[in-house]
């Protein structure tokens, strides 16, 4: 349906491992990283661990301020973390807002779009079809997890969909046996 090929999917031991792998692959000391003030805490800890220059965008009513993201992102921005719906606030942004943001970002800037709570978003304006955006935005990675929606948090299984070249770079540092037989 979305033109997703097998080499555009990388399984991991949950989204947590993928956040770590993305940070280790794409963030160098001093790299500019943009993220929300209140969001999944692993974005902050892994970015700090890699020595990133963090630009924290304040929330508006506990929701992402994508206009604030546009102002914060510069030609030097290496990576942008997005969580939709946001963890821990539960707020979300609509597809048209996401597209406007993506179109304002340089193709040299990696955009990580985390959909860990995708299945729990019932609002009609929540973007149900982000995967089609990968065709136009090859600098975007979409993270998904099976742990939340299927109640299997202890099994630690997730995957990321995106450009095969980006996933190939991540795969070079991934442990070869990271996803267990049981998961």
Which residues does each predicted region cover?
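Active-site pre-lysine segment of PLP-dependent enzymes
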Residues: 48, 66-75, 88-111, 115-147
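Short glycine-rich anion-binding loops that position phosphate/pyrophosphate groups of nucleotides
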Residues: 15-16, 40, 84-88, 118, ...
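PLP-dependent aminotransferase-like
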Residues: 25-82
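Conserved beta-strand segments of alpha/beta enzyme cores
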Residues: 8, 53-55, 139-141
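Phosphate-binding glycine-rich loop
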Residues: 1-32, 50
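PLP-dependent aminotransferase class I/II
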Residues: 139-183
């Amino acid at each position: 349906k979305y033109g997703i090929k097998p080499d555009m999917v990388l399984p991991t031991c949950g989204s947590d491992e993928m956040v770590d792998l993305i940070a280790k692959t794409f963030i160098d000391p001093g790299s500019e990283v943009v993220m929300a003030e209140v969001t999944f805490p692993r974005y902050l800890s892994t970015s700090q661990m890699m020595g990133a220059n963090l630009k924290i965008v304040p929330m508006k009513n506990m929701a992402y301020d994508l206009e604030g993201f546009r102002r914060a992102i510069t030609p030097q921005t290496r990576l942008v973390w997005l969580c939709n719906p946001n963890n821990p606030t539960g707020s979300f942004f609509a597809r048209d807002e996401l597209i406007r943001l993506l179109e304002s970002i340089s193709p040299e800037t990696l955009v990580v779009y985390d959909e860990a709570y995708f299945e729990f978003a019932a609002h009609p304006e929540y973007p149900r079809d982000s995967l089609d955006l990968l065709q136009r935005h090859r600098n975007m990675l979409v993270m998904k997890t099976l742990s939340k929606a299927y109640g299997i948090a202890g099994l630690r299984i997730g995957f990321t969909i995106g450009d095969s070249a980006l996933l190939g770079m991540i795969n070079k540092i991934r442990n070869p046996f990271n996803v267990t037989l049981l998961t």
